[in-house]
Amino acid sequence: MKMIEGGVTAAQGFVAGGIHCGIRKNKSKPDLAMIYSEKPCAAAAVYTQNLVKGAPILVTRKNIADGAAKAVICNSGNANTCNADGVEKAQAMCDLAAQALGIEPQDVVVASTGVIGQVLPMEPIQAGIPELVKSLSAQGSHAAATAIMTTDTLPKEAAAEVEIGGKTVKVGGISKGSGMIHPNMATMLCFATTDCAISPAMLDKAIHQVTEKTFNMISIDVDTSTNDTFAILANGAAGNPEITAPGPDYDAFVQALEAVCRTLSKLMAGDGEGATKLLICQVDGAATLDMARTVAKSVICSTLFKAAMFGADANWGRVLCAIGYSGAAVDVNKIDVSFRSAKGQVDVCQKGAGIPFSEEEASLVLGEGEIEILIHLHMGQESAQAYGCDLTYDYVKINGDYRT
């Protein structure tokens, strides 16, 4: 398995595009994206855990209940959530996309992202979709990734390839999300594609398995959005024997999908609103996988810890505090904590107690743009990673001005 270029159009048979249709006032910000495969695709998706769900999720869930789709249509700048006519408009987006592509409306995945509670204007979408379809290309991943952005500062793309059944299988994806990001599918959209031949049931199994290890391990601000969707389409163009059961071929596919999603997870965490640092919390030596995940997420979610990282302050006590209230049955007297970056590693806690370290060295280590928090529980063999970012003054500024 290796990472490659190409994003969501790396896989054979997929095209994508993105344009500005007029939902957003700023003409320099694209706001309508599409992904399409002429070949029929197996389809699967996971959605937000928020009880308040955007209208597009309700429509998409219905459309791919049969495990099939051929296209994705997504707008940014408006969430189409908490609107009386939201479902009607989400369905209309599917109808318009299907008409322009010459496919059935039920073969369209629809998504929206932006401000909650504002009426979604359909006129620019209706006028823009024909132009969007004309723009579709096998080099359109970047345009699509840009068109789904909201407060993101950069488009997020990743792709990988792996050998399955003697064929080269490619998996690619794009994602957005820099605020309202918290474990259990937060304000993020991710659209993945693959030319792997895989049954809808196994594709669904894979997407759930990978989400638990990647997207559900991100937290930026402990807010869970209403519109989160991770959808994947598989058109089988690689020509591998169809994956219909667990085994080596399935494991190879999951490895590639996980690599793509982990890369996108890190890109989202590092692009958190106002963020200056990507934080990676690595927990080892847990008694169970659930313990490892719980501890990692608790630390990465700690507001006080995130603020300390912004200030390059090696306040390891905030790490232990977050572990303590996580609910995980750890033994505090066994916990080791270290910080690591490109500048080196500094050990700050052993067996639950502080040890002497150089504050100057620690500040250098924590001054880098990517920081690892290394936690060893010494209780077992399980491990987990969680991803987040520092908490800065700009986070408040961005969200204070979000609707203006």
Regions found by a protein language model. Name each.
Residues M1-E88, A92, A98-T404:
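A structural signal for small-residue-enriched, beta-sheet-centric alpha/beta enzyme cores
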